[in-house]
Amino acid sequence: MKAISVLGSTGSIGTQTLQIAEEFPEQFRVVALTAGRNLKLLVEQVQRHRPEVVALADSDLLPELQERLKDAGVTGADAPQLVGGADGLNVAAAWDSADLVVTGIVGCAGLLPTLAAIRAGKDLALANKETLIAAGPVVLPELKKSGSRLLPADSEHSAIFQCLQGTPWAENARLSTGVPTPGLRRIQLTASGGAFRDWTAADLEKATVADATSHPNWSMGRKITVDSASLMNKGLEVIEAHYLFGLDYDHIEIVIHPQSIIHSMIELADSSVLAQLGWPDMKLPILYCLSWPSRLETPWRRLDLTEVGQLSFRAPDPAKYPCMELAYAAGSAGGTMPAVMNAANEEAVAQFLEEKIHFLDIPTVIEAACERHKPDLMAQPQLDDVLRVDQWARTAVREQVNRGVTRLPMGAIAA
């Protein structure tokens, strides 16, 4: 039986991970949970899974959680150890009895707990892509030092990882080196196109929060759904793929695939192309992380290509998706630039969700932060440098929003 810790248990990745644990009680045991402010759901999770430790990001909520657990009958030997704050999250992430840590905390907030798990030698199911995007130069040496294995829990990188299992370089694809995988020529990341894939560039002028958070294929959190609509999510995945598999950015491509059946493809040295297919369901890549290197039989819906009918593909329009171009540029710049770009995007999306800026303002404020950072870019940052520029970028975006955003004309960034 594999003991798992779930960081961000009340979020989209966390809840689906716990559903899998319930479906396979003889395979997985939950030993640690961390959460934000959804105490009602967290108490229900504790009742069902009986973890050894529970951590809250906000330590001020610990007394309320303790009372809620008591009212729910979780007392005495059944009660988990409760810890809070940043230190508490790190304690849960490095929990001694855990074999695998699922990192489902959204955004750069997941960086420090992920590093704590790595330094404790834990294997990771990485759903928090921002960890590598913002701090790849910091994380990769830590992985090498600890011997932790990093398995991708998002659908695209899981697809690449699964395809590599069918090559002679499978052992080299444990995702802990960041060096080029031999024989891997090209990666093609598939994108649904998000909520606005069938909108024209002109239509985006009337985009609302409700529009941007209505994904046609996937069930995900609000922030990542907005990132999907802007194609920033795919741009972030390009940077993550660079760190995971070691390919240069010129060899990592994005292709829009509206059906979301092919989850990504790899091209090998002999020009063969391998792909992983399945219905758009995040539980599949999460399960593979939990069960790897084995595969578990499931009663889940099986793929029927005759039901799908056809698979279509098209190139993304850089003028319509300027965030994609910003991600490529930040990744190519390297150093602290991806951290600045990622933090600026997180803050810009938060401002959009609060209806303080328009959807089309998101790339404008991101680009402004990246431009301001260019003179101060650090090529070989340490952890403190990453955390510092992360906070700087968030502040820069808020200040720009408060001053008022002068939107760039459509296509200006791509040009």
Swiss-Prot record:
Q: InterPro entries attached here?
A: DXP_reductoisomerase (IPR003821), DXP_reductoisomerase_C (IPR013644), DXP_reductoisomerase_N (IPR013512), DXPR_C (IPR026877), DXPR_C_sf (IPR036169), NAD(P)-bd_dom_sf (IPR036291)
Positions contributing to NADPH binding: 10-13, 36-38, 128, 130, 221
Question: What does the entry list as the binding residues for 1-deoxy-D-xylulose 5-phosphate?
Answer: 129, 155-156, 192, 215, 228, 233-234, 237
What domain of life does the UniProt record list for this protein's source? Bacteria
Q: In which pathway does it act?
A: Isoprenoid biosynthesis; isopentenyl diphosphate biosynthesis via DXP pathway; isopentenyl diphosphate from 1-deoxy-D-xylulose 5-phosphate: step 1/6
Gene Ontology terms, MF aspect: 1-deoxy-D-xylulose-5-phosphate reductoisomerase activity; manganese ion binding; NADPH binding
Q: Which reaction does it catalyse?
A: 2-C-methyl-D-erythritol 4-phosphate + NADP(+) = 1-deoxy-D-xylulose 5-phosphate + NADPH + H(+)
Protein residues bound to Mn(2+): 154, 156, 237
Give yes or no: UniProt keyword Oxidoreductase: yes
- Alphabetical UniProt keywords: Isoprene biosynthesis, Manganese, Metal-binding, NADP, Oxidoreductase
| Cysteine pairs bridged by disulfides in the record | none
EC number(s) reported in the record? 1.1.1.267
GO terms of biological process kind = isopentenyl diphosphate biosynthetic process, methylerythritol 4-phosphate pathway involved in terpenoid biosynthetic process
Cofactor entry: Mg(2+); Mn(2+)
| Function of the protein | Catalyzes the NADPH-dependent rearrangement and reduction of 1-deoxy-D-xylulose-5-phosphate (DXP) to 2-C-methyl-D-erythritol 4-phosphate (MEP).
Q: Which family does it belong to?
A: Belongs to the DXR family.
What is the protein's name according to its record? 1-deoxy-D-xylulose 5-phosphate reductoisomerase
Species: Synechococcus sp. (strain CC9605)
Lineage start:
Bacteria, Bacillati, Cyanobacteriota, Cyanophyceae, Synechococcales
In the UniProt record, the gene name given for this protein reads dxr
